[in-house]
Amino acid sequence: EQVKIRFRASADNVDRVYLVCNGEKIPMDVEDGNKLFDFYAATITAGENMINYYFEIHSGRVTCFYNKYGVEKENNNDFNFEIYPGFSVPKWAEGAVFYQIFVDRFCNGDPDNDVLDNEYFYINSGTKQVKDWFKYPENMDVGCFYGGDLQGVMNKLDYLQDLGIDVIYFNPVFVSPSNHKYDIQDYDYIDPHFGKIVVDEGSVLPDGCRENKQSARYINRVTNKANLEASNQFFIELVEEIHKRGMKVILDGVFNHCGSFNKWLDRERIYEGEEGYENGAYISADSPYRSFFKFHNECEWPYNGSYDGWWGHDTLPKLNYEESDKLTEYIMNIAKKWVSPPYNVDGWRLDVAADLGHSAEYNHRFWREFRKAVKEANPEAIILAEHYGDPKQWLRGDQWDTVMNYDAFMEPITWFLCGVEKHSDEFRGDLLGNPDAFIGAMNYHMSRFQRPSLGVAMNELSNHDHSRFLTRTNRKVGRTHTLGPDAANYDIDKGIFRQAVVFQMTWPGAPTVYYGDEAGLCGWTDPDNRRTYPWGREDVELIRFHKDMIKIHKTYEALMKGSVLFLHGAHKIICYGRFTDNKQVIVILNTNYEDVDLRLHVRRVGVFNHSIMTRVMLTNEQGYTLETVDYMVEHNILTIKAPKMSAMVLVRK
């Protein structure tokens, strides 16, 4: 297949341009141009192998190089452009607006499925049914349940649709004993506490009892086939309704580890002797699931607790894929099952994906097989991974589509606007308002993505693992056990938060709203970041602001799919452009407590002389306005005053 590669240079600014492709130096010819730019082009033949390239530019006696990191005096091959033939991501995901729901804390639509007091024992305590919806999470919150469920999500679909949401991402929803459900008990079924309980028999644990073998009510609720099948059926109906509204659904895939309650291990002896279930690997050395886990003491059966736990957590047994083809096959079938009829989920978010397996070699092998399985079942399903650090080796077209964008989004914008780390664990005054650090971090970490992956990267300000962004605006270091939950609400700055949302909705990728952020929810890091959605106590102005920014994001193709280029960086100011061939958007963030006069060279993003730039959004410390104001570009420069503590979005007419 013939592939044309183009290079843009300022008109009459360079003498020669070469495409250096897989080591071959190819002259590029001027194909066309306008009064601003010359466009050089070269055509290459693509096969099945990766294409690696950069540009060499000559202007008089000056030679420079251009790669993903930008213009360099010497080329660094680590930043070369790459094309992986056949690699594509779902088109529906590019620029799509995601909404993350931690189900137990979103909305209680069915009180009949609520976890009961002392229904079972989990991590040093009997379960607690929290009856005050607005009560702050306890410091040891994992066994406290507020009653949020999938019926609650169904009840609030009108709200999500009106907000402008395209994709709902659920934290885990499969049978699990914790409220976060990253300790899967049964991958085949939706937890009836989130779904439907149609047969509700048995008693809760007696006072003081820690033996879950006696938790008759819980055992019935999560093993009774009527409850499990009714819950799966309700999930089918929920996905159908979401799809009818033009939205998608993403599930959380926890495949590195499961839970100690899992039927394959059964440390709690919940499934022992139950009809239709075989002995778990904890119960017996003869269990058909023994190879699913790595045991360190072969002499402890029955009831062998020497299994390998993820990071030493005995409630999170690590899955032993290398020694169990049966386990691998099972998980691949799970991956296919939920993206196929009748469930028809639109993709997976993969928990701690780089940790899976016991070697890097096996990890990559597993995800290649996983991608093949999922894409064969549903070619339009997205595969996005939780990942900290350089994702490049997984984003080569054969494993993940993209990642949760910590390094090239959440972390840099948090440092720039708030000066704190994303857990609120550290303050760095040298990074607060530092444009060089911000732009450098963004350019470097974005260079680790393939272009398709960057366009669908999950851009979050907050999530279930980090402090709420609105709390970060108070620039305090703390957690709920050090400063207390009330402190997360104090000294917050909604003006800074609005700047962050403007950035989120105008930056390349898929902006992802963590439930409640749009309603003014605060919170320190886990577990305080998992407060309930404040129904009836919402910050209506912030919801309206999110709705308006989402509308702006969707209105302009340049914000959904356009290129990005930094135009200006100064103390506490950043400015960038998003642009396609025929549409340009300019964004200005001024975090100074004074107005700043700017002269922006906008020709680099394709804004011609005498163009009119129309302001469509202005935020400030008190609120925001959609009142439009026009600015004329003269001598290829946009002269504009950026008000103190503001964010501006301008669109070329």
Question: Language model features by range: what are they?
Answer:
Residues 7, 101, 160, 170, ...:
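Conserved, mostly hydrophobic/aromatic
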Residues 103-105, 168-180, 252-262, 351-356, ...:
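Short, solvent-exposed turn/loop segments enriched in Gly/Ser/Thr/Pro and often Arg
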Residues 51, 153, 231, 235, ...:
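Aromatic/hydrophobic pocket-lining residues that form the small-molecule binding cavity
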